[in-house]
Amino acid sequence: MQLLQSSVIAATVGAALVAAVPVELEARDSCTFTSAADAKSGKTSCSTITLSNIEVPAGETLDLTGLNDGTTVIFSGETTFGYKEWEGPLISVSGTNIKVQQASGAKIDGDGSRWWDGKGGNGGKTKPKFFYAHKLDSSSITGLQIYNTPVQGFSIQSDNLNITDVTIDNSAGTAEGHNTDAFDVGSSTYINIDGATVYNQDDCLAINSGSHITFTNGYCDGGHGLSIGSVGGRSDNTVEDVTISNSKVVNSQNGVRIKTVYDATGTVSNVKFEDITLSGITKYGLIVEQDYENGSPTGTPTNGIKVSDITFDKVTGTVESDATDIYILCGSGSCTDWTWSGVSITGGKTSSKCENVPTGASC
């Protein structure tokens, strides 16, 4: 009898253990987190992470760094952030083969109006940067709807990252928002940004360093346009193999721009601006300037950064009457081998201050 009872107990325990195994594996496969703390502590226990209506506490980062290879992250509901003056970031994601997505109807709202004071990163309140995609390699970010970043939107330092159909809407910051760059790219390779929609008050795209970068099918409204630079003065001062194409820039200070730092060294090469349409530009339609110092132009170009093998092809549109159509200020001998085709920017003034314009281009 004792032997029979022992056998029954053993069989019952064994069956319970077997039944528990699928439940445990399912938990590892998919997790839903409703707090930033739980997401941080449990992020490596699941292959699919759903972030549901998370309220990130003031002064904290929604920390999704060091994810397991192949993790999928889904933003669901509304993601919000507590108020504190600090540098951020509000969100940080890293890992390999990561997919960052959002559920239908989701939004990520920085509520930047709490920080906006017209000074951006140049003074006033200390404002947190929004989304660090650093070491987010062989990965993708798709379909995010982002609103009201306090300052910079995406800081990108990654390899093989695809960003598709992302919206950054800072239109509420027209009066007081400042330095709300959408995509800042540095020390990165093989970055592809496709189908971005941006309403902001600074660069729609700014590439400070990196190679094999594409930006296509973009819509940029209200900011400073599509920029290479500023290049120079950093540890990495090379921009090469960049294509910016099939995009619209409207109601912005600049259309397309290359800016390099005064008295610095570096390289800008094999950069193509193709099929770019401009309208409502208030400062410069097309600008290349090699005189940037402390964030402002000096009017005196230097030639330590070579700007070569540059293509402006079918960059067309209009600027406001008090704006300048085209402005090229190159250092002596530093702007070479440009291809200039189908460029037609009208409505503004013709600059009398262009210098060292390369053969084939016009100013």
UniProtKB/Swiss-Prot annotation:
The annotated active site, in chain numbering, is: D202 (proton donor), H224
Q: Which reaction does it catalyse?
A: (1,4-alpha-D-galacturonosyl)n+m + H2O = (1,4-alpha-D-galacturonosyl)n + (1,4-alpha-D-galacturonosyl)m
- Tell me the protein's name: Probable endopolygalacturonase B
Which stretches are PbH1 repeats? 158-187, 188-209, 210-230, 239-260, 268-290, 302-347
Main location per the UniProt record? secreted
Keywords attached to this Swiss-Prot or TrEMBL record, sorted alphabetically, are: Cell wall biogenesis/degradation, Disulfide bond, Glycoprotein, Glycosidase, Hydrolase, Repeat, Secreted, Signal, Zymogen
Q: Where are the transmembrane segments?
A: none
Q: Name one GO molecular function term.
A: polygalacturonase activity
Gene behind the chain: pgaB
Q: Which residues are glycosylated?
A: N162
The compartments listed are: Secreted
Q: Does the keyword Signal apply?
A: yes
Q: Which residues form the signal peptide?
A: 1-20
Q: Which residues form the propeptide?
A: 21-28
